[in-house]
């Protein structure tokens, strides 16, 4: 048996002990849920249950919900994750015990200076940053931002008109991706870009590079399986966020800030300016104000959080309207009644449109971009008879809850009437969570909704959308880490008349 190396007994023993220790390292947490009497799929050494994610988070969560009931345990590598669906426990996790036990989201690898971004920051650091940013998202500030967003709505209409004139079906993600990029770079950095027609613009290139992110990426998976790599990578200055992109944006924001501090007479209302004002406000204690690096981190996280959610949701809405022409017509009638002769929308007129709100809410139910909500348990706790040990990640499977027939009649169907005034009060706020809920919900929720509604109003004033032979019906979701379609959403776009107002 020449292929077996001739090693000393001690060496073989050392090798055997090393393998046993390695196996124990890769499996030592995997008995937790069995010990607690919580069901779930069988984990593999080191990997846990992450291989199931290849079928998509949404599909895996739906299958677990059907198979195991209202609670189950999974393992992301060695990390125990407890899925809960009881609205009372969800309320305790997201609201009642948010500040004391479930303050933080799960850390997801080396992030460098981005650790101070509001979505990533922890404990007192998060509370300080949230309190500094909250005034930026008041209704008064949003009102002032409407004209900024509206100007990109005009660019969107021009681009749609140009594409429609070619007589070819239009890829919704391309069009709304450009709109989303323009609004976010405009409101976060104060730069004016028509990104669809200027794809080489350095801001566009840097932000797009920043957005190439997938939870099933080998780099991300390796950190999930071997969490001890995170501090090593942090020490080596390696980050999940591409360094060339963050470096470009850091320099750009520094330059823009210096320019604005010199030109104090010009009145601006965008996120960057509001954060600069917060830094210099007499009401903000100097030791609590945002540092320049923290300001950059917030601007970058606004891109990260806002681009995909806005562009994808708008694409899903247009698909639903195209495949439900009665809903599209009813929505256009509401828009025309509130804003005759293609009048521009204002903050107050948007709030008057009940049916628009219903359409957006129902689309967010069918396609919640945040498929899961997560909080880390900071100490051993018992909630409604369920013991949750310290260090466990508590996960709310939003997508699965949005399709639970116990809460939604015919959950697969697009029915905006679910969110009518008469029905809205019957919806449990801990079952319908497209933006999360509680103190750590999405801080930009109202901005995101206003942004999407302004785009929809301007587009539907000027165009109607129809399916074409390239449109995938029914829509199929891609298997993978993010909520994306298997094929691009492609629709036929028809001008409602021969002219486009204001474009």
Swiss-Prot record:
One Pfam family in the UniProt entry: p450
Keywords attached to this entry: Endoplasmic reticulum, Heme, Iron, Membrane, Metal-binding, Microsome, Monooxygenase, Oxidoreductase
Membrane topology: Peripheral membrane protein
One GO CC term on file: endoplasmic reticulum membrane
MF terms in GO: estrogen 16-alpha-hydroxylase activity; heme binding; iron ion binding; monooxygenase activity; testosterone 6-beta-hydroxylase activity
Origin superkingdom: Eukaryota
Cell compartment(s), UniProt: Endoplasmic reticulum membrane; Microsome membrane
SUPFAM superfamilies (UniProt xref): Cytochrome P450
UniProt cofactor(s): heme
Induction of expression: P450 can be induced to high levels in liver and other tissues by various foreign compounds, including drugs, pesticides, and carcinogens.
Chemical reaction(s) catalysed: an organic molecule + reduced [NADPH--hemoprotein reductase] + O2 = an alcohol + oxidized [NADPH--hemoprotein reductase] + H2O + H(+)
EC number(s) stated in the UniProt entry for this protein: 1.14.14.1
A biological process from GO: steroid metabolic process
Keyword hit for Metal-binding: yes
Chief localisation class: endoplasmic reticulum
Binding-site residues, heme: 442
Transmembrane segments annotated in the record for this chain: none
Family: Belongs to the cytochrome P450 family.
Protein function: Cytochromes P450 are a group of heme-thiolate monooxygenases. In liver microsomes, this enzyme is involved in an NADPH-dependent electron transport pathway. It oxidizes a variety of structurally unrelated compounds, including steroids, fatty acids, and xenobiotics.
PANTHER family with a match to the protein in the record: CYTOCHROME P450 3A5, CYTOCHROME P450 FAMILY 3
Name this polypeptide is given: Cytochrome P450 3A21
